[in-house]
Amino acid sequence: MKLIKLIFFLSLFFQTISLADTNIEFENWKKNFKKIALKNNISESTFDLVMSNTKFLPNVIKYDRYQPEFYEDTKTYISKRTSDKKVKIGKQLYIDNLSLINSVENEFNIEKELLLSLMGIETNFGTYVGKMDILSSLATLSFDKRRSEFFTKELLILLNLIEKKQINYKTLYGSWAGAFGYFQFMPSTMKNYATDYDKNGSINLKSNPDAYASASNYLKKIGWKSN
């Protein structure tokens, strides 16, 4: 028993040291990344404001290494995400937002059934949009070597959107991979397809008007054809 306890505490000790070293490396990475950001039209004031509190998130690395969706066949994936209860919620959501959803459908020519189905699958109709700090998630994945180039680009795009005041950085909580809003847009998707449908001066993908219109605009632009 004493040996087991010793092994446990030694393991915990070395994990703590390892994380401390990683945090130091991450802070050094942030200093180097700041130079890249400034060269990509991010002001120093914006960078310091939104990146000063970003942290290395060990769980993000774990999630990136093991993504459950990749281990499920299509039938299993769909069966886990559809139910009579979910269909009922979707119908009620349509009734509650009848005018808006019909308006978006007419403007973008994207079926409301498709739109609501995607919303149900992605975030359970907006009830679970993720709680991760997207800036820290993207910074962690950019710092990590596995897919650094991809996530560095996504982080720079997000910083540019914040710089231009197109999105509010205080609302940026979502998935571990940096996806955001009712339809889980990555920053590059936000940049290319997000729409300020309610014309309030900023894009909020956690609001029904902007979320529905942005998802419909995305589907239209990538070539979806209604039946």
Task: Name each model-derived stretch.
Residues 37:
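Intrinsically disordered, low-complexity polar regions and short flexible loop motifs
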Residues 2-20:
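Classical Sec-dependent N-terminal signal peptides that target proteins to the secretory pathway
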Residues 19-30:
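Cleaved targeting-peptide boundary
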Residues 41-227:
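Catalytic glycan-binding domains that act on GlcNAc-containing polysaccharides
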Residues 6, 10, 27, 110, ...:
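Generic hydrophobic-segment detector
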